[in-house]
Amino acid sequence: MKEKFKLTKLERNWILYDIANSAFTLLVSTLIPIYFNSLAGSAGVHEDMYLSYWGYAGSISTILVAIIAPICGTLSDRKFKKPIFLLTVLLGCAACAAMGLTTHWLLFLGIFVIAKVGFHSSIVFYDSMLPEITTDKRMDNVSSMGYAFGYIGSVIPFVACLVLVLFCDSFGMTMGGAMVCAFLITAAWWAILSLPLLRSYKQTAFVDGEGAPLKDSFKQLVRTFKEAKKEKHVFMYLIAFFFFINGVYTIIDMATAYGSALGLDTTGLLLALLLTQVVAFPCAIIFGRLSAKYDTGLLIKVCIVCYTCITVFGMFLVSLWQFWVLATLVGMFQGGIQALARSYLGKIIKPERSGEFYGLMDICGKGASFLGTTLVAFVSQITVGIEVNVFGLQLQNENLAVGSLVILFIIGYLVFCKADAMSKARV
């Protein structure tokens, strides 16, 4: 009889942080874009520009994280992983709570950028802990369970926030007041559930370093690139990751803004994205279980192909029921591709170099996110007022912008096939 998979205490605490930060991720992909559209609309910003400004804000945050990530990676591989991880968590939580302090749309975007920088910087440290808190054999399963419980756990604070926002009149509140409460609830959830990992994690894998870490960070980044180029399978994988995760992150970040820009019902959009979280929970666990039976590389290829099809479907989205279908399909593969991509890297690198390589992976991920959000924002902006008839459907600028992501999934798939073949040849 097969032994039941049981998590260790450290693995459980590591997964708890996924539950903690996923509350912010869910808020970013649901309520925050809608609230921003409300602020921008009240300030006289044209509705055709909502998606563009939102996309540019996401792009700015990813540029900043790409600059910071090498420093995070270098510090992570020394003996500073835990204290700097704490600082990034505090930055993200504080900025999240502060987002309710302004009703000026541009200042709101500025605070939002700071919150995203704190969030993504903490993820560099968090991901780099994975090779230390578990074994190679358990890594796929633990990584998948992190995403799975992150999806379902984040529903708890989100439902509380959603009830406050949708029924704010019944509570004697304005939408702005309800959003202030939503930001505070999310920040508190994020901070409190971070504590178990902060208390129990002890860094065991590190390299000795002398000199100033900040000064050495970008030198280390160059060395890491050179090391990755020597390890050609790692280098090719990071290139593939850059392209395929591009579409994944962009769809996550801009789903609500996309639906809102198309004029779809706000309540329906939020409930559909709540469905995404519920669907993602069992599907992420299933992918973790499948990784014990099937090759991780094969599963990643399946996810990329499915995401390509999802993007094509999303391009033709014109009604709410189609958004519900899109939300369900995204939920089926979102957790799987993120979890397997994270653990795949952990298997092909040395544990003591995990910080710098996961920092490099984060640069690739954020660079991809920058490319994706900028691409969507740019295409949306230059095609304002243009309608294209395809199969009898009138596609607007937002539809065309989403369709532009398909080519990146295709490139990611082709490069990953090459990288996976190279990795297998080394075994």
Language-model features, listed with the residues they occupy:
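Helix-to-loop junctions at the C-terminal end of transmembrane segments
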Residues: 67-80, 282-296, 380
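A membrane-interface helix-boundary motif in multi-pass transporters
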Residues: 47-48, 165-188, 378-409
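Glycine-rich segments within core transmembrane alpha-helices of 12-TM secondary carriers
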Residues: 143-165, 362-373
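Multi-pass alpha-helical transporter architecture, strongest
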Residues: 189-200, 402-427
